[in-house]
């Protein structure tokens, strides 16, 4: 047998070097096998970016000082929400917001040490990023290309919302991301029985309730949360009521000082009434000058109650359509009619063995997509979006672009156009119309995706062609 001659090494030429660099860049951006290396490096790089922003960009006080003024009144003993004001208006957030900013007030000398608060929000941002990266990996099981992780850290506006504005939306976002990953874990561990998933569903109800207690926008997730809890609890309605009870009890516990459940005198009734009236005011009016999404409409239309009713109707209709898609027979393992009838067998589990929630490979993806899509529907039909509201869905946007089956280049273009909409200040007719169009496009592409929850054996490049 003749000896095997070693292959000739490629020559060190400029052309070969450039070719190697191009191949490396392509792998770093588009090869899913590189995501496990790229994502941690992005997190570390973004932690440096956060420090640079805090150290070089001036903090802008929009609501934070008003939050501190409101907290000061509460610390003086005022519990009646109708008497708690700051420079920008009355206190309109639930008790979780009060507790969170009370802690910040305590450690920042009443808000005077803004640098400390910025650092706290910097860590909060990095926590959100870490949870998002973990959820992405868990959902895609290593199949998501690195470019979508790059998009996770690419929003200038999102960085500003966290460390230069200090809005309470940031804490709600963190708690919702925590809730999602706990639900993902609950679905995954069904492969080993039902006890661990049930315990995790109770923990998820806890974090979800805490998110609601900070800001009401977390309620946009409620339909998805209830659906997933029902599935994780074996389609046993009695069992699923336990997480719902936890959710309610946490609300009572967090808001105890204002709800005063054991007191029924006139003063307690007034404090309780003011709390629910202001902290959970669904009829709150928004200012036209701050709207990011409906600027292409006239101010008269924006303030018209019939327009608000239309948005609510479209929200419900779209939500129902997506729920029907999520509950397709191939996902739940039985006809939809049987699923509905089984709800009335509330005393026993009726979950099909072939339900997607029982598939540890696909259920984390199902959980994330159902939660993120339901939230995005609420965002699309919101009566108004202010600049800080970007944080409501920014961390899920790259994943939703991935689920929309856009190719890499299209995803980058859509993301850049979306970021442009949030950077324009004040919003214009063009930027707001573009924003609504982008959100609508993403939802349409997800809805028309016939392979929304493919087997993980399907190569990633097949999903995005």
From Swiss-Prot:
Its EC number is 2.4.1.258. InterPro entries: Glycosyltransferase_ALG3. Residues 1-33, 105-120, 182-211, 261-306, 386-407, 454-465 are lumenal. It is found in: Endoplasmic reticulum membrane. The chain crosses the membrane at residues 34-54, 84-104, 121-141, 161-181, 212-232, 240-260, 307-327, 366-385, 408-428, 433-453. PANTHER family: DOL-P-MAN:MAN(5)GLCNAC(2)-PP-DOL ALPHA-1,3-MANNOSYLTRANSFERASE, NOT56 - RELATED. Belongs to the glycosyltransferase ALG3 family. This is Dol-P-Man:Man(5)GlcNAc(2)-PP-Dol alpha-1,3-mannosyltransferase. The lineage of its organism: Eukaryota, Fungi, Dikarya, Ascomycota, Saccharomycotina.
């Amino acid at each position: 047998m003749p000896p095997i001659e070693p292959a000739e090494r490629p020559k060190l030429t400029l052309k070969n070097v450039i070719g190697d660099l191009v191949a490396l860049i392509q792998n770093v951006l588009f090869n899913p096998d590189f995501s496990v290396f790229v994502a941690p490096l992005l997190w570390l790089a973004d932690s440096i970016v956060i420090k640079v922003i805090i150290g070089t960009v001036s903090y802008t006080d929009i609501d934070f000082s008003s939050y501190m003024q409101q907290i000061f009144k509460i610390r003086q003993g005022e519990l009646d929400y109708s008497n708690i004001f700051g420079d920008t208006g009355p206190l309109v957030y639930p008790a979780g917001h009060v507790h969170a900013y009370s802690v910040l007030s305590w450690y920042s000398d009443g808000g005077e040490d803004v640098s400390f608060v910025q650092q706290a929000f910097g860590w909060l941002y990095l926590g959100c990023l870490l949870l998002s990266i973990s959820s992405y990996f868990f959902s895609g099981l290593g199949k998501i290309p690195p470019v979508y992780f790059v998009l996770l850290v690419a929003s200038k506006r999102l960085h500003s919302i966290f460390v230069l504005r200090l809005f309470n939306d940031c804490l709600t976002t963190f708690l919702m991301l925590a809730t999602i990953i706990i639900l993902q874990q609950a679905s995954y561990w069904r492969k080993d029985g039902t006890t661990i998933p049930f315990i995790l569903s109770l923990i998820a109800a806890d974090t979800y309730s805490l998110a609601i207690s900070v800001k009401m926008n977390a309620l946009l997730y409620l339909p998805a949360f209830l659906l997933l809890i029902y599935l994780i609890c074996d389609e046993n309605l009695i069992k699923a009521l336990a997480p719902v009870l936890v959710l309610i009890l946490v609300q009572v516990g967090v808001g105890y000082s204002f709800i005063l459940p054991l007191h029924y005198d006139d003063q307690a009734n007034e404090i309780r009434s003011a709390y629910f009236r202001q902290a959970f005011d669904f009829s709150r009016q928004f200012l036209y000058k701050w709207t990011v999404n409906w600027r292409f409409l006239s101010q008269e239309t924006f303030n018209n109650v019939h327009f608000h009713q239309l948005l609510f109707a479209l929200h419900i209709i779209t939500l129902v359509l997506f729920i029907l898609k999520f509950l397709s027979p191939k996902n739940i393992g039985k006809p939809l009619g049987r699923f509905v009838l089984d709800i009335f067998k509330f005393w026993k589990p009726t979950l099909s063995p072939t339900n997607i929630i029982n598939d540890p490979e696909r259920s984390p993806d199902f959980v994330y997509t159902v939660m993120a899509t339901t939230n995005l529907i609420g965002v699309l039909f919101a009566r108004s979006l202010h600049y800080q509201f970007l944080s409501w869905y920014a961390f899920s946007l790259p994943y939703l672009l991935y689920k929309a089956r856009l190719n890499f280049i299209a995803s980058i273009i859509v993301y850049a156009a979306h970021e442009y909409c949030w950077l324009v200040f004040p919003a214009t007719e063009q930027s707001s119309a573009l924003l609504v169009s982008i959100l609508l496009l993403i939802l349409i592409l997800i809805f028309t995706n016939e392979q929304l929850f493919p087997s993980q054996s399907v190569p990633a490049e097949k999903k995005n062609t």
